Amino acid sequence: MPIKAIPKVSIARNGIGAFVNPCHRITVQYCNWGGSSTHLRELLTNGGLNNYAKSKPDIFFEIKQLRGHPKLIFHYNNNVTKEVEIKNIKQNEIIKTLTEYSQRSGNELFKFNHKVKSINDSVRGIWSPLQVPKGYRHKI
């Protein structure tokens, strides 16, 4: 008698089966008059930002014209927003900033230099200097 598999609906997990981008919306704010927004205005007029937005269809781009310095606001899935000021930054640096922050998870960056922590016991056991034969022990 053949064994039949039980049908089950797959559970959506990030990285298994489907990938959900953590950055779901980017707001671009610029001033139409200010000098610090010139490079961003050039990026908007020559279609560079449009090409970038076409390459990222899973991110919603919102462009606002407000007074003040230009900035990029990144909205992440964990309800975190990051604001990055891009005043007087060249076009290629703006694109680099867009790619860098759109690939982040929204969590704070931290330096991972902690010791390994595990809930499992060590395979070798805990080392003790008394495990070494007496002839090889360190003598002071």
UniProtKB/Swiss-Prot annotation:
- Which cellular compartments is it found in? Mitochondrion
For this entry, list what GO says about its biological process. Answer: mitochondrial translation
| Keywords, comma-separated and alphabetical | Mitochondrion, Ribonucleoprotein, Ribosomal protein
The keyword Repeat is assigned to this record: no
Q: Which InterPro entries match?
A: Ribosomal_mL43, Ribosomal_mL43/mS25/NADH_DH, Thioredoxin-like_sf
Chief location of this protein within or outside the cell: mitochondrion
Name one matching Pfam family. Answer: L51_S25_CI-B8
**One MF annotation (Gene Ontology) recorded for this entry:** structural constituent of ribosome
Task: Note the Gene3D superfamilies from the entry.
Answer: Glutaredoxin (3.40.30.10)
Q: Can you supply one Gene Ontology CC term for this chain's record?
A: mitochondrial large ribosomal subunit
| Family label | Belongs to the mitochondrion-specific ribosomal protein mL43 family.
Q: Which PANTHER family would you find in this protein's record?
A: 39S RIBOSOMAL PROTEIN L43 (PTHR21396), LARGE RIBOSOMAL SUBUNIT PROTEIN ML43 (PTHR21396:SF2)
Protein function: Component of the mitochondrial ribosome (mitoribosome), a dedicated translation machinery responsible for the synthesis of mitochondrial genome-encoded proteins, including at least some of the essential transmembrane subunits of the mitochondrial respiratory chain. The mitoribosomes are attached to the mitochondrial inner membrane and translation products are cotranslationally integrated into the membrane. Also has an extraribosomal function, being essential for mitochondrial genome integrity. May interact with MHR1 to take part in the mtDNA repair mechanism.
The entry describes its oligomerization and partners as: Component of the mitochondrial large ribosomal subunit (mt-LSU).
Q: State the protein's name.
A: Large ribosomal subunit protein mL43
**Species of provenance:** Candida albicans (strain SC5314 / ATCC MYA-2876)
* Gene transcribed to yield this protein: MRPL51
